[in-house]
Structure formats: C-alpha cells, structure tokens
Amino acid sequence: LGDVYKRQAENYTLDDELSYLIDNREMWFIPVINPDGYVYNELIEPDGGGMHRKNRRNTNCGNGTTRGVDLNRNFGFECGADNIGSSSDPCSEVYRGDSPFSEPETEAVRDFILNHDFKNVLHYHSYSNLYIHAFGDGSYPEEPDLTTHREIGLEMARHNGYYVGTGLDGIGYT
C-alpha cells in the first residue's frame, strides 16, 4: 500500500482523476491487520518474503509458525462453515480461532467497518499476492460495479503483478 500513498502524493496535481477522487471521496486504508505477524515475518525473513499468516497468540503449539490464529479465518461470515478453508486445530496453519472475532485484531476491523458506511471495498491480500474484490460468497457484483472493481484492481496490479478477482476465483474458496 505504500505505493498507493506515494502515488497519491506525487501525482495529485498531475492526474485529474486522482485529484477528483481525493477531493470528493473518503478513502480509508488499513495497511496492516496483523501487526504481530508482520513483525514476526521481519524476524524470520529479514530480507522480505516472509509468509507467516497467523498472529502470535499462544495456542500451545510452540513458538514457531504454528503458533497463533489465522486472522483471515477469524471473521464472522460463515466462520468455520463446513471446515472448508479453515481448521479448528490450534496448530493448523489455517486455525480460525475459538470463535468468530475472538482476536482483538479482527474485532477492531469489525468495529471500524460497522462505524463507516462503505460503498466499495478492495481487499489487498498480501499473503497470496492478491487484490480481492466483492463478493466473498462466490457471486459477482452487478455491472457497472464488477467492471469498476476489476479496473481499480488491475490499475493497482499493474505496479506489482498481483492477481485481481474474487476470493473464489483467486484461491478457490471464500
């Protein structure tokens, strides 16, 4: 996301579309949802490329990469449904936690979302190098929203080659 901020600052007066968006829209960025996992990645992969996905909550699975809760699996929507894409095993890489929003990080994101009336959301999923757009249930937004989601994601991906699509399209489950 650092490139997004930098582009906004450097191109504000040069890009009419960008200037319009900044002047007439609210944009919110949450650059890191998993600060403990982020710091742990820096420790285990100081040159970058760390792919530790869990926070650092003690789940009695040692002190390595099996420790913690996968925050992407700890949100409320169909959390743990059919055990697809997540696990109830605390030592699993995709452990979803004891219950939806059991982690302070996901609770904070939930509360932030509930306190804002978002019209659009683009999810930057750094673990898999994805830009995930609506919807997360396997369906697609109606036009022109689908095209808008894809155009925004493709413009961002032009700078880093990330995949753009829904969670179902990108990783095979939602």
Where are these regions (language model features)?
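Flexible, small-residue-rich helix->loop connector segments that border functional cores
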Residues: 6-23, 76
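Alpha-helix capping at helix-to-loop junctions
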Residues: 10, 35-38, 77-80
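Glycine-rich, flexible loop/turn motifs
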Residues: 18, 34, 67, 71
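Short, small-residue-biased leader/transition segments that mark boundaries at the very start
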Residues: 1-5
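Short, conserved secondary-structure transition motifs
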Residues: 20-41
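Metallocarboxypeptidase
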Residues: 47-174
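Short, well-ordered alpha-helical packing segments
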Residues: 6-9, 30, 110
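Short, well-ordered secondary-structure micro-motifs
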Residues: 40-42, 133-134
